[in-house]
């Protein structure tokens, strides 16, 4: 009897040990998967362009969040839901500070910083102040200013004249253009018309101060929307295409890529993150 009892106890112990080992193995696998998933998670800061707001990234942000990423879509002072703050004191530094402060107060690190159109001015300035926090920088059909340039320098002669007249009248902003100016897809015209707001003039009057921080970001990308003609964006794209330290993409789309092709934009952003 004693031998039989011992044999049963031994068998039970083996089974218990095996079960425990199995649970441990599953836990280890689960833990490894969690770590791997966490490693794949990125933090995106998406900066909009002229007359827009964080709202324009809604579709892209939703897609990124569903894939486990953290997303911030700050709206710049005087635009979108912050249009009530429009004033003549808003300049480029104001908008740079808007984004810098999100990064600072949220304690963000290893971020993918994206700037669309006018947002290229903003992220260029942001990189100067938060370079250690940026792991990837993306210019989405965006301006790429050089040190000392101001927005007015890159405007057309007609646009410069219109801004000059607006300043003489004491105006502090310029109305949002119709969606056809940006070649926005017709299905999104109503969305643009409902949300777009005036752009503060002061942001185009202040020269930017750069030391080349954006070039020191580890991963650099330029995305060109070929469905929108703009010599500034085309020149920026061609210059980066010839530079092996940059990745470049083209999308057959109007200027507002995040509105018209959010799925493709998200694919690219995940590739370059």
Where are the predicted features?
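N-terminal secretory signal peptides
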Residues: 1-9, 20-23, 27
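C-terminal segment of N-terminal export signals and the immediately downstream linker at the start
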Residues: 29-47, 54, 62, 66
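Active-site glycine-rich loops that stabilize anionic/oxyanionic intermediates
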Residues: 49-52, 117
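Conserved alpha/beta-hydrolase
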Residues: 65-83
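Active-site loop/oxyanion-hole signature of alpha/beta-hydrolase fold enzymes
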Residues: 78-111, 128-129, 155-156
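Conserved hydrolase catalytic core segment
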Residues: 114-146
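Flexible "cap/lid" loop of the alpha/beta hydrolase fold
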Residues: 139-171, 232
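Conserved loop-alpha-helix segment in the C-terminal half of the alpha/beta-hydrolase fold
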Residues: 227-252, 259
């Amino acid at each position: 009897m004693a031998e039989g009892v011992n044999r049963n106890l031994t068998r039970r112990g083996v089974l218990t040990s095996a079960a425990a080992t199995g649970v441990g193995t599953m836990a280890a696998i689960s833990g490894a998967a969690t770590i791997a998933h966490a490693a794949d998670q990125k933090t995106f800061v998406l900066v909009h362009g002229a007359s827009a707001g964080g709202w324009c990234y809604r579709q892209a942000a939703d897609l990124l969040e569903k894939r486990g990423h953290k997303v911030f879509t700050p709206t710049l002072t005087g635009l979108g839901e912050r249009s009530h703050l429009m004033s003549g004191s808003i300049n480029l530094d104001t908008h740079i500070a808007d984004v810098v402060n999100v990064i600072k107060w949220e304690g963000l690190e290893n971020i993918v910083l994206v700037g669309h159109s006018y947002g290229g001015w903003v992220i260029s300035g942001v990189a100067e102040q938060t370079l250690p926090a940026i792991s990837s920088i993306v210019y989405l059909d965006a301006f790429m200013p050089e040190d000392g340039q101001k927005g007015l320098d890159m405007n057309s002669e007609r646009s410069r004249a219109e801004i000059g007249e607006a300043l003489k009248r004491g105006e502090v902003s310029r109305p949002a253009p119709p969606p056809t100016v940006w070649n926005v897809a017709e299905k999104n015209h109503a969305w643009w018309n409902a949300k777009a707001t005036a752009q503060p003039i002061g942001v185009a009057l202040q020269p930017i101060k750069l030391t080349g921080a954006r070039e020191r970001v580890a991963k650099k990308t330029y995305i060109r929307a070929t469905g929108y003609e703009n010599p500034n964006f085309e020149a920026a794209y061609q210059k980066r295409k010839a530079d092996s330290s940059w990745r470049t993409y083209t999308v057959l789309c109007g200027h507002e890529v995040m509105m018209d092709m959010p799925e493709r934009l998200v694919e690219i952003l995940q590739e370059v993150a």
